[in-house]
């Protein structure tokens, strides 16, 4: 009888100790998490709240990863917009050339020299004036005509301009020498002045870079040769 009473006393003491430990150390695993979710979202279900929270957190990550690509595209477009005006400026740069073509005055000048030699021979019967007029005047006419032909083809007529400048210098020197010896204004004085003006004109065309290019080239000149 005494042993049964002692067993009951031991059982009651262990039961009290178990209840005391369960009261003093509660398990905080599930309830605080459900309480935090309910206090933030205000929903009764726990699973949708956690899913919405993870979706909201993932949005800034996507935005952050997409920003560097957008900045790279913006920098690329900015570089293209900067380089385009430079290319346009290079393409629209004007070509350095004279305002007037050499043959515009070269052909009339050559014809005037030839006619002056013929008139001088007709009045004075001087073979020197005839040879000078025909030789140098014919050379000026030939060079001016060739310069016009080459210019129409879109090629450079710079050598023909230099040739006309040399011939005009020779005609000027001969007529100036004849005028200084005879003191006759016509024809030596007049041709000396005209030749000096033409020499200045040819010098201007040469220093300016030659004749200006034609506005419309022929198809044969623009098409590449194979």
Curated annotation (Swiss-Prot):
InterPro entries: TMEM14 (IPR005349), TMEM14_sf (IPR044890)
Covalent S-S links between cysteines: none
Induction summary: Up-regulated upon induction of early leaf senescence.
Entry superkingdom: Eukaryota
Disruption outcome: Reduced biomass and male sterility. Reduced size, thinner inflorescence stalks and flowers producing short siliques containing almost no seeds. Small vascular bundles with reduced secondary cell walls and modified cuticular wax composition with strongly reduced content in C29-ketone wax components.
Entry keywords, A to Z: Chloroplast, Membrane, Plastid, Plastid inner membrane, Transit peptide, Transmembrane, Transmembrane helix
Molecular function GO terms recorded: fatty acid transmembrane transporter activity
GO cellular component, one term: chloroplast
Tissue occurrence: Expressed in cotyledons, leaves, sepals and pollen.
Predominant cellular place of this UniProt entry's protein: plastid
Presequence positions on this chain: 1-39
Transmembrane segments annotated in the record for this chain: 130-150, 158-178, 186-206
Membrane topology note: Multi-pass membrane protein
GO biological process, one term: fatty acid transport
Bias (Polar residues): 67-80
Annotated compartments: Plastid, Chloroplast inner membrane
Location of region: Disordered: 66-87
Family stated for the protein in its record: Belongs to the TMEM14 family.
Additional notes on this entry: For all TMEM14 proteins, 4 hydrophobic alpha-helical domains are predicted. However, NMR structure determination of the human TMEM14A showed that only 3 of these helices are membrane-spaning while the amphiphilic N-terminal helix is probably located at the lipid micelle-water interface.
Function: Mediates the export of free fatty acid from the plastids. Potentially prefers palmitic acid (C16:0) over oleic acid (C18:1) and stearic acid (C18:0). Not involved in fatty acid activation. Required for biogenesis of the outer pollen cell wall, in particular for the assembly of exine and pollen coat and for the release of ketone wax components.
Name used for this protein in its record: Protein FATTY ACID EXPORT 1, chloroplastic
Source organism of this protein record: Arabidopsis thaliana
Name of the gene: FAX1
């Amino acid at each position: 009888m005494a042993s049964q009473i002692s067993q009951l006393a031991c059982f009651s003491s262990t039961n009290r100790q178990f209840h005391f430990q369960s009261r003093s150390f509660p398990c905080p695993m599930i309830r605080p998490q459900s309480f935090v979710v309910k206090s933030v979202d205000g929903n009764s279900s726990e699973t949708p709240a956690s899913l919405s929270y993870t979706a909201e957190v993932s949005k800034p990550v996507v935005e952050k990863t997409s920003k560097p690509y957008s900045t790279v595209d913006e920098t690329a477009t900015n570089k293209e917009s900067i380089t385009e005006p430079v290319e346009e400026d290079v393409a629209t740069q004007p070509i350095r050339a004279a305002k007037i073509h050499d043959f515009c005055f070269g052909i009339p000048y050559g014809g005037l020299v030839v006619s002056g030699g013929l008139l001088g021979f007709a009045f004075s019967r001087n073979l020197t004036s005839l040879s000078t007029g025909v030789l140098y005047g014919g050379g000026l006419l030939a060079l001016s005509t060739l310069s016009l032909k080459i210019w129409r083809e879109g090629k450079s007529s710079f050598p023909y301009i230099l040739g006309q400048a040399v011939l005009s210098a020779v005609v000027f020197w001969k007529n100036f020498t004849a005028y200084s010896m005879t003191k006759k204004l016509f024809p030596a004085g007049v041709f000396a002045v005209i030749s000096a003006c033409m020499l200045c004109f040819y010098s201007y065309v040469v220093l300016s870079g030659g004749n200006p290019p034609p506005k419309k080239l022929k198809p044969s000149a623009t098409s590449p040769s194979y």
